[in-house]
């Protein structure tokens, strides 16, 4: 669960967890969580550390657990970005506005103004197209990859060059997924 304004983060968590835990995983915005829990007698709330404190109160009220998951360290992607030539234009595409904001801060702290950064939510087609036209490299999350690839295919004639696509395979760290599996009792 995350706030409605960044439900994309919940969707990324769900995308990583669903195939790895053999229990139903449902995306519920924080604003609707009490309503959902009032009609259910069990469950586990999974969120990022940023939202754990308010969700622990809700969990306690309804007798369920709230567990924070840790994000990937994105070392593969950051290593690639560290090696890019000064002046390169990098596009970041995600379903999560929170992830985009965090990525911008991290990349700026790492490279300063050496790289030109552009960001787009994957469902904002006009902004995405502008980003694809300008960028040498695109970093995207898993759910955005097909949108990026389809937009590139549809608009190839408008592009001077095809950008290199770097897809972040995991949103959550492997360790946090394994820990969560232990917590909920689904270790293989």
Language-model features: where?
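C-terminal regulatory/effector modules of DNA-binding transcriptional regulators
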Residues: 1-188
């Amino acid at each position: 669960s995350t706030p409605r304004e960044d439900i994309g983060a919940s969707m990324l968590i769900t995308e990583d967890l669903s195939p790895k835990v053999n229990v139903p995983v449902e995306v519920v915005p924080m604003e609707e969580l009490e309503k959902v829990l009032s009609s259910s007698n069990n469950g586990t709330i999974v969120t990022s550390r940023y939202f754990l404190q308010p969700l622990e109160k809700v969990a306690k009220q309804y007798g369920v657990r709230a567990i924070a998951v840790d994000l990937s360290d994105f070392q593969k992607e950051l290593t690639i970005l560290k090696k890019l030539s000064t002046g390169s234009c990098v596009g970041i595409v995600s379903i999560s506005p929170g992830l985009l904001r965090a990525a911008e801060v991290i990349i700026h702290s790492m490279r300063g103004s050496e790289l030109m950064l552009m960001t787009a939510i994957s469902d904002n087609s006009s902004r995405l197209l502008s980003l694809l036209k300008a960028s040498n490299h695109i970093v995207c999350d898993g759910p955005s990859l097909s949108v990026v690839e389809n937009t590139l295919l549809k608009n190839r004639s408008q592009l001077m060059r095809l950008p290199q696509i770097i897809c972040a395979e995991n949103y959550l760290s492997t360790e946090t997924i394994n820990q969560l599996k232990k917590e909920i009792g689904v270790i293989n």
